[in-house]
Amino acid sequence: MAKSKKPVVVGIEILKKNGLDVDSLIKELVINASVEFTAYYYFTLLRANCTGMDGEGIKGVIEDARLEDLSHFESCIERIYQLGGSLPKDATQFIKMSGCEFLQLPPNPTDLTAILEKCLKAEQGAIVNWDKICNMTLGKDPATYDIAKDILAEEIEHESWFLELLYARPSGHMRRR
């Protein structure tokens, strides 16, 4: 079925013509996929350790961010493969490239402030990562730009949730979507 001849992919050729380094973009998308997947995993652990009366209210916020991180991971995968890339075959290597070791449970695994600080740090890192993709693709790759722009907006929203909880800083939302 599969032919050994490498196909011409017009969608990729146009991006190159637009001045985009497609290989660099794939590399950044794989890193972002790793970050989103690892954040999803660690947010699962952090959420589970939000205990007691105060923890119950925080679980929902972490759960919303966690599920959106899974969606971000899925968006990355689709675009990586469309661009001719792939994920690493070794899951350990994939997780290590995320740099998310800081998201492990705090020494006191039910310390809600420490959990929220970890969540905030994760969201702020994601903002930097997705801003980088937006800057790489602006005016060169509208498909990836739209994905990155939408994810960036969600990461900024998540940051505001955790800032609100940690610093009593109004976030502007009436309820999470």
Identify the role of each PLM range:
Residues 1-177:
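Iron-associated oxidoreductase/ferritin-like identity signal
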